[in-house]
């Protein structure tokens, strides 16, 4: 193993990055600064140097990645951070050793998902200046997994776990291995000016390349994101509360997802107080869509499950701009079940209620504004849709259809027909 390269610097030698960083730690002492020196070769794993820097300067200090490439050849678990500033000026490049990652990826703690890096702690500032980059070498993964959904042990790129008062800003994520970012057991944190591009160079959809997933988290703000991918742009999953998504542009993916949820038999989960505003959609499938598992447990996560309890409520989306949406902007499906099985779309005990969608305009490929495939056991309640101006791309007609199944209480629209009941997780057939 190459020797660990770690350089201790005085604060006065550092050019202060673009966000407001302090030369003093929370305790009033001057910050210790660690600059990670790259090994300079893909054969040299830079993880030992990174972990050493975060150990030395991870409490009241600053860790600097210079404008170089750092080779990430092994997993990282750095959850002890406290009042630390991480300054990424270069690129973190993950290796393409699929066998290693499948055998060593770390558990996320939800849906049997795995990850390459778990990062957590208190008062973390992670600054990328708009060019600091995570490169997951995703093309190798997209070819390897093919059409297999949730390939076992395929890692998320970054998991923010147990963080409080964190700020992640100006980071670029390209070619993520799977989900770009999972945010779990985290609170009072801000993720701003994040760029994600997970397109598959060989064509087709790079599935499971979500921009971000919130899980068991509260008071999370995601602003000024740009996501180009083949799956959920951003997803709020189990026990996500007080989440704000604003001033974002989403391209090519499925749109903002609530779920999937209701996957664990008998478990009570919620998504509450989600605020979505000022979003631009470029050729996504939907604007906002809901996906819950059926009332029957078939198999186990990540590709099986069902029978979960709970509700999604107090969800508001406003000021949405679309360019050639592929499907209805607002959909609900309660049909998710084991991969390859046909689910019962009407027996979920997970309820969806108190939704407000206002001020959506642009173009769409669908004549449907909404497709709500709700459970008969726990019908959807109190849905408002107002100020819709969606022109069907290529002509002058407008989307005016509202398809409903088991919906009680509508404001601003009337249901115009029955929803197509099918096993699609995205509310269509």
Curated annotation (Swiss-Prot):
Induction entry: By rhamnose and sugar beet pectin.
Family per similarity comment: Belongs to the glycosyl hydrolase 28 family.
Glycosylation sites: 67, 77, 97, 103, 112, 135, 219, 239, 247, 278, 344, 387, 395, 414
S-S bridge residues: 374-380
Leading EC class: hydrolase
Catalytic center residues: 231 (proton donor)
Subcellular location: Secreted
One cellular component (GO) term of this entry: extracellular region
A GO term, aspect molecular function: alpha-L-rhamnosidase activity
Signal sequence, start to end: 1-20
Catalytic activity: Hydrolysis of terminal non-reducing alpha-L-rhamnose residues in alpha-L-rhamnosides
rRNA processing as UniProt keyword: no
Annotated source species: Aspergillus niger (strain ATCC MYA-4892 / CBS 513.88 / FGSC A1513)
The EC number(s) this enzyme carries: 3.2.1.40
Alphabetical keyword list: Carbohydrate metabolism, Cell wall biogenesis/degradation, Disulfide bond, Glycoprotein, Glycosidase, Hydrolase, Polysaccharide degradation, Repeat, Secreted, Signal
Domain of life: Eukaryota
Protein name: Alpha-L-rhamnosidase rgxB
């Amino acid at each position: 193993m190459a020797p660990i390269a770690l350089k201790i610097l005085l604060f006065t030698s550092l050019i202060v990055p673009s966000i407001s960083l302090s030369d003093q730690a929370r305790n009033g002492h001057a910050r210790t600064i660690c600059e990670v020196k790259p090994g300079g070769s893909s054969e040299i794993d830079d993880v030992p140097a990174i972990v050493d820097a975060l150990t030395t300067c991870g409490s009241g200090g600053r860790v600097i990645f210079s404008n170089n490439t750092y080779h990430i050849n092994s997993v990282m678990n750095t959850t002890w951070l406290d009042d630390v500033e991480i300054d990424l000026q270069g690129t973190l490049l993950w290796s393409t050793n699929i066998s290693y990652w499948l055998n060593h990826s770390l558990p996320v703690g939800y849906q049997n998902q795995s990850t390459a890096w778990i990062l957590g702690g208190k008062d973390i500032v992670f600054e990328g200046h708009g060019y600091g980059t995570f490169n997951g070498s995703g093309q190798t993964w997209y070819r390897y997994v093919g059409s297999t959904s949730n390939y076992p042990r395929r890692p998320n790129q970054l998991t923010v776990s147990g963080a409080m008062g964190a700020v992640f800003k100006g980071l670029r994520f390209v070619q993520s291995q799977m989900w770009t970012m999972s945010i779990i057991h985290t609170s009072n944190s801000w993720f701003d000016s994040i760029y994600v591009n997970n397109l598959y160079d060989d064509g087709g959809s790079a599935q499971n390349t979500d921009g971000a997933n919130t899980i068991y988290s509260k008071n999370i703000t995601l602003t000024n994101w740009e996501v180009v991918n083949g799956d959920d742009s951003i997803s709020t999953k189990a026990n996500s509360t007080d989440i704000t998504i604003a001033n974002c542009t989403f391209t090519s993916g499925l749109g903002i997802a609530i779920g999937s949820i209701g996957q664990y038999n008998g478990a009570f989960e919620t998504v509450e107080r989600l605020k979505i505003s000022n979003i631009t959609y470029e050729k996504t499938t939907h604007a906002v869509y809901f996906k819950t598992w059926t009332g029957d447990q078939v198999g186990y996560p990540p590709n099986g499950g069902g029978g979960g309890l709970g509700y999604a409520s107090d969800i508001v989306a406003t000021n949405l701009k679309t360019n050639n949406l592929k499907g209805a902007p607002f959909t609900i499906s309660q049909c998710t079940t084991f991969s390859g099985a046909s689910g019962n779309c009407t027996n979920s005990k997970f309820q969806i209620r108190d939704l407000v969608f206002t001020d959506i305009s642009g173009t769409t490929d669908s004549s449907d504004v909404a497709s709500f495939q709700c459970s008969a056991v726990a019908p959807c309640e109190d849905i408002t849709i107002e100020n819709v101006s969606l022109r069907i791309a290529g002509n002058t007609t407008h989307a005016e259809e509202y398809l409903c199944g088991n919906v009680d209480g509508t404001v601003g629209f009337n249901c115009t027909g029955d929803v197509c009941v099918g096993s699609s997780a995205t509310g269509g057939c």
